[in-house]
Amino acid sequence: MRHGTLRVDVVTIFPEYLEPLNVSLVGKARARGQLNVHVHDLREWTYDRHNTVDDTPYGGGPGMVMKTEPWGDALDSVLADGYETDAHGPALIVPTPSGRPFTQELAVELSERPWLVFTPARYEGIDRRVIDEYATRMPVYEVSIGDYVLAGGEAAVLVITEAVARLLPGVLGNAESHRDDSFAPGAMANLLEGPVYTKPPAWRDREIPEVLLSGHHGRIARWRRDEALKRTTANRPDLIERCDPSAFDKKDREMLSILGWFPDPDGVPHGRFWRRPEAMEE
């Protein structure tokens, strides 16, 4: 677990897009000094009267590419403030649909770093030489928040920052709150969180599951685990397929069997450990 304040720097041509970082849990974390966010306008490092940050791509093609000079000068300026080259220095986060998937596991990894610098791009992206240059100085994470394309990377910055910030010590009111999150490391790795309920116990003729009123912690834990398995098999079967059988106990395997999932020895070399009966017949 990390200690101290997490520093976040964001270089963007739309600083106002980052306003949501002033509200909710992230805003409170900033007010308490757990999160130190600096947003920088990339155009402050342009030197022509049009504040140009993009140009046509070499090799032709549609769209524009963000220029090396503004990005290089901006990052040099940001990094000059407290820059270190060891593990305690910054990591560069490049939001891009061509990056590695952003996962809860990666959020945990980033939450243990002291300093994150984001480069949300627009247009067709940033000239590749910028990324390659800073990769020689610090860890670079090219990260995608999904298999779709946005107009720019600022929305991804908001997503990643919130996912990371809520993992910082003291940000959540209850330190155990994220233990049972979907994808949380440990027992919930590769599983989606099941349904949750609160008062009143009955609403419009719909009652909460009786087990939740039983006070029996073991039965409640088993029910929650079964509901997580049900939801994951229904909504994200790909997650179940690649779960190592050793991650499941006897009761987990019984529930998976009821749901129509069985070990798939033939799939192990391909990273697939489970299959549904209909898939096994194909």
UniProtKB/Swiss-Prot annotation:
UniProt function note: Specifically methylates guanosine-37 in various tRNAs.
Any single Gene Ontology cellular-component annotation: cytosol
Gene: trmD
Subunit (UniProt): Homodimer.
Protein known as: tRNA (guanine-N(1)-)-methyltransferase
This enzyme's EC code(s): 2.1.1.228
Family of the protein in this entry: Belongs to the RNA methyltransferase TrmD family.
Organism for this UniProt entry: Streptomyces avermitilis (strain ATCC 31267 / DSM 46492 / JCM 5070 / NBRC 14893 / NCIMB 12804 / NRRL 8165 / MA-4680)
Gene Ontology MF annotations: tRNA (guanine(37)-N1)-methyltransferase activity
Subcellular location: Cytoplasm
GO biological process: tRNA N1-guanine methylation
Keyword Methyltransferase: yes
UniProt cross-references to HAMAP family, sorted A to Z: TrmD (MF_00605)
Chain positions recorded as S-adenosyl-L-methionine binding sites: 145-150
UniProtKB keywords: Cytoplasm, Methyltransferase, S-adenosyl-L-methionine, Transferase, tRNA processing
Chemical reaction(s) catalysed: guanosine(37) in tRNA + S-adenosyl-L-methionine = N(1)-methylguanosine(37) in tRNA + S-adenosyl-L-homocysteine + H(+)
One Pfam family it belongs to: tRNA_m1G_MT
Ranges annotated as spanning the membrane: none
Main location: cytoplasm
Enzyme class at the top of the EC tree: transferase
Cited InterPro entries: Alpha/beta_knot_MTases, tRNA_m1G_MeTrfase_C_sf, tRNA_m1G_MeTrfase_TrmD, tRNA_m1G_MTases_N, tRNA_MeTrfase_TRMD/TRM10
